[in-house]
A protein has these predicted regions:
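Short coil-to-beta-strand transition motifs
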Residues: 319-330
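Short solvent-exposed strand/turn elements
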Residues: 339-354
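Structural signal for hydrophobic/aromatic residues that build the beta-strand cores
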Residues: 18, 69-72, 250, 285, ...
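Internal glycine-rich, Lys/Arg-flanked active-site/core loops of soluble domains
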Residues: 149-312
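Eukaryote-biased intrinsically disordered, low-complexity acidic regions enriched in Ser/Thr/Pro
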Residues: 2-160
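Conserved mixed alpha/beta core segments that line enzyme active sites in large multi-domain catalysts
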Residues: 314-316
Length: 354
């Protein structure tokens, strides 16, 4: 069965959400009901099976019985919980705290060293795939089918490793359907998959954030073969080809005192600049970004490659902008707001050619 991007109803989560009852005793009638969210990809799998009028949807750890509205553990039929299908306006979708407040680099090393505008992870992916800088898929469309297939296979392999094989197969199949399309369509699919709440964006960024940490080099290099092809397709953006300027982005974080002190030190060294090595989700909406963490990054974009994901995302109200790996920053100012009990760290973002 064909699987399309969220322009088609089977993959449109903007109005539908499946939830499972998460009370310690899901059958208790005396406790207030507590409902938890499935991941975005699990929601896609469940909703597709529901619309196809299948008796059940098979997930990695559970299956959903549509006749009795139950979640059942795959290995134990007696482990059951109620589920429900919620239809709502897209404005009501819950905000994703971790996506906009986890550190854009490793916690031990709060920012990467300066590497220039191409991430070493991307450089190593190109080397592994034997792709020259002037032979990117956006410039050589004949490369697209092979790269898409490698990306799909890598997603599946990573999913198996994490125990998320069915989620991985769902995303891989969505990507495979674009392998005979042009690079713009492939990139939109990659951006959509990245925007979903799943292991894919988490695993990719976890690996890329380790770049520059000598103790973790083997760890991030081990992901080049599996996650590298997808990373390259997402990085080779044929749509946002002009650097963005004169905009302000926001990102919450939970920083330790020593991490805040490191940013304060950079204020006194205006010529010092660092770079983000992973894809970093930020918001144009200060109020939403300020909801989470003890620190708010306020980022003034002087000139950098940044992609607007809000029109592709299942969460348009997050106003998500994706900062490309390798974008550099200077720390302009660090303030502490006593009323809000929050640090404000002002960054200046720019693209380095060095």
């Amino acid at each position: 069965m064909a699987t399309a991007l969220p322009t088609e109803s089977k993959n449109n989560l903007k109005h539908v959400e499946w939830m499972w009852k998460s009370n310690p005793n899901p059958w208790s009638k005396s406790e207030p009901a507590q409902w938890s969210h499935y991941s975005d990809v699990e929601n896609l799998i469940i909703e597709e099976a529901f619309l196809d009028k299948k008796p059940k949807a098979i997930l990695d750890d559970y299956y959903i019985d549509f006749q009795d509205n139950l979640q059942v553990l795959n290995t134990d039929y007696n482990r059951q919980r109620p589920v429900k299908r919620v239809v709502r306006n897209r404005e009501d979708k819950h905000l994703r705290e971790t996506r906009f407040m986890d550190l854009p680099t490793t916690s031990a090393r709060s920012f990467g060293g300066q590497y220039g505008w191409v991430s070493p992870f991307v450089v190593e992916v190109r080397r592994d795939l034997r792709i020259k800088p002037n032979e990117l898929p956006s410039k050589k469309p004949d490369m697209i089918p092979t790269l898409v297939e490698k990306a799909a296979n890598g997603i599946i392999e990573e999913g198996k490793y994490l125990g998320k094989e069915r989620e991985a197969e769902k995303m891989a199949n969505m990507l495979r359907e674009k392998k005979n399309k042009d690079m713009k369509e492939v990139w939109k699919c990659c951006a959509y998959l990245y925007s979903l709440e799943s292991f894919l964006y988490q695993s990719l960024n976890a690996a890329m954030r380790l770049v520059g940490d000598k103790d973790k080099e083997d760890e991030w290099r081990s992901k080049i073969r599996t996650l590298g092809p997808f990373c390259l397709l997402l990085w080779d953006d044929p749509i946002h080809i002009k650097m963005k300027t004169d905009m302000v982005l926001y990102r919450g974080a939970k920083l330790k005192p020593e991490q805040i002190a490191a940013y304060e030190t950079m204020v006194n060294n205006p010529d010092e600049h660092r770079s983000f090595q992973a894809f970093s989700s930020c918001s144009r909406n200060r109020q939403k970004a300020e909801e989470f963490g003890n620190t708010l990054f306020i980022m003034e974009v002087k000139g950098a490659f940044i992609a607007d994901l809000s029109k592709l995302s299942e969460y348009p109200n997050e106003e998500e902008e994706l900062i490309t790996p390798g974008v550099c920053f200077r720390v302009k100012k660090v303030e502490f707001d006593r009323k809000k009990n929050k640090h404000f760290i002002y960054l200046e973002l720019f693209q380095s050619s060095s």
